[in-house]
Swiss-Prot record:
Origin superkingdom: Bacteria
Species annotation: Mycobacterium intracellulare
Alphabetical list of CDD domains matching this protein: ACD_sHsps-like
Protein name in the entry: 18 kDa antigen 1
Family recorded in the similarity comment: Belongs to the small heat shock protein (HSP20) family.
Disulfide bonds: none
Signal peptide: none
Domain sHSP: 21-131
PANTHER family: HEAT-SHOCK PROTEIN 20 FAMILY MEMBER
Amino acid sequence: MLMRSDPFRELDRFAHQVLGTAARPAVMPMDAWRQGEEFVVEFDLPGIDADSLDIDIERNVVTVRAERPALDPNREMLATERPRGVFSRQLVLGENLDTDKIQASYSEGVLSLHIPVAEKAKPRKIAVGRGDGHHAVAEGAAQREVINA
C-alpha cells in the first residue's frame, strides 16, 4: 500500500523542484561514442515533448535544454518520482568536429546528436615536390612515386 505522505519523498521532490529550475537546471544522463567518421551523443529524456527541446551551439559549445512541465497542483499525488522542470547539459566539442553539420533527432525518449569529424581533421596524404618533375607521396614508412605527365 502506498503511503500518502512520506517525509523523505517530500523532501526529495522539493529538492528536485528547487534544483530543476531555469536558474539551476537538472542534469540529463547521456552516452557518447565515436562511430566511423562521426561522434554520436544520446540523451535520455523520457516523457519530454519534442517541442520543448532546444539545442544551441556557440563556437564549440553545444547546449541542450528540455523541460518537463510541473504537475497540476490540484492533483492529489500518491507518488512523484519523475523529475520535473528544466534539464540542461553543455558539451565542449573539440576543434576536429564539424559543428556546422550537426544533426539531431528525437525518438522514443532519446535525443541523438550526430557530429561529423571535420574534413581538416581527417587523415590525408601530402605530396612532396622534387626538382625532377616527380612527386613523392608520403604514406607512413612507405613511399609511392607519382609522375607528372
